[in-house]
Amino acid sequence: MARIAGVNIPTNKRVIIALQYIHGIGPKKAEEICEKVSIPPERRVVDLTDAEVLQIRETIDRDYIVEGDLRREVAINIKRLMDLGCYRGLRHRRQLPVRGQRTHTNARTRKGKAKPIAGKKK
């Protein structure tokens, strides 16, 4: 197994798919990385040489924010919104949907399990 950005990527998959196992790299970025390193995307990870794996690793480290750094950056951005006291920050603080979804019904994922209310039975 090749280890890139602290993640063991699967060896039997194509490079473009295997790179997507890294948090912060999706289909488009995986394609960009393959272009930069000039590796055909349909090539398998098993067939990569150590030099090619090293090139991929260096490209990701140099050009992309991935894994822990990305998670940390997102958490800091959310914390900044909460400290500002803006609408989005308040929604995060109250653990409600942030992007304008309705909450009268639905939003159970964000709000958690429904809390029973006494005397509400019919």
Curated annotation (Swiss-Prot):
Residues 95-122 are annotated as: Disordered. GO terms for molecular function: rRNA binding; structural constituent of ribosome; tRNA binding. Keywords: Ribonucleoprotein, Ribosomal protein, RNA-binding, rRNA-binding, tRNA-binding. One of its GO terms (biological process) is translation. InterPro entries: Rbsml_uS13_C, Ribosomal_uS13, Ribosomal_uS13-like_H2TH, Ribosomal_uS13_bac-type. The keyword Protein biosynthesis does not apply. GO terms for cellular component: cytosol; small ribosomal subunit. It comes from the Bacteria. Pfam families: Ribosomal_S13. The keyword RNA-binding applies. PROSITE patterns: RIBOSOMAL_S13_2. Part of the 30S ribosomal subunit. Forms a loose heterodimer with protein S19. Forms two bridges to the 50S subunit in the 70S ribosome. Located at the top of the head of the 30S subunit, it contacts several helices of the 16S rRNA. In the 70S ribosome it contacts the 23S rRNA (bridge B1a) and protein L5 of the 50S subunit (bridge B1b), connecting the 2 subunits; these bridges are implicated in subunit movement. Contacts the tRNAs in the A and P-sites. Belongs to the universal ribosomal protein uS13 family. This is Small ribosomal subunit protein uS13. The lineage of its organism: Bacteria, Pseudomonadati, Pseudomonadota, Alphaproteobacteria, Hyphomicrobiales.
